[in-house]
Amino acid sequence: MRGHQIVAMDLPLEDPDAGAVRYAEAVLQALQGAGDDVVLVGHSMSGLFIPFVANQRAVRKLVYLAAGIPKVGTSVVDRVLHGNESDMFNPAHLNKDPSKDEAVAIEILFHDCKPEVAHWAISKLRHQASRVVFAEISPIQAMPDIESAYIVCTEDRTVDPAWSKRTARELLGVEAIALPSGHCPQISRPVHLAEVLTSLTK
């Protein structure tokens, strides 16, 4: 993204006890010294804790990329099993770990990548040891009162695109921006994604 400083996050994926607060702390630490003009992008699971970050420090905009959105007072598990959001995830791939099974990784994450790109991406995958962020009641007391955007990946095989569109409207009050890609456009369509993200910084 030309003209923009990019801050990459090193999340504590290997910590079996890490929940939203622990993940948010890692983001807050990475953003030390970044100033106030921050557009924070949360991909996939990261959407569940980027609002917590925005409640702790100055953030200009939140962007959810094929991401979960937290709901105050409940957990993702309860929403899926006992609420009206059973379509949040693709049920065919629940309890399958793409970091341990190359075929699963290609099927649900990198199906729209060139083979050599998919294999490179698989080599970079890290196992997410904790499921706390999905099982815990969201620690967010209130959603931050800042501008938000949602990018729905129309060929997503992990987070259901229909759920993304509906929930972006219901919880964020925005119409999702459609990106023709699978769950990981930063791998399969980086130029297109960069264009969309750049437009959202204006």
Question: Which positions does each model-derived feature cover?
Answer:
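Flexible "cap/lid" loop of the alpha/beta hydrolase fold
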Residues: 55-103, 131-138, 160, 165
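Conserved serine/cysteine hydrolase catalytic core
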Residues: 128-191, 195
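Active-site loop/oxyanion-hole signature of alpha/beta-hydrolase fold enzymes
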Residues: 5-39, 54, 77-82
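Short beta-to-alpha linker loops that shape the active-site pocket of alpha/beta-hydrolase fold enzymes
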Residues: 10-14, 68, 182
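Short, amphipathic alpha-helical "lid/cap" segments that border enzyme active or binding sites
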Residues: 24-28, 190-198
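Gly/Ala-rich beta-loop-alpha elbow adjacent to hydrolase catalytic centers
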Residues: 41-46, 50
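Conserved alpha/beta-hydrolase catalytic His-Asp/Glu region
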Residues: 96-145
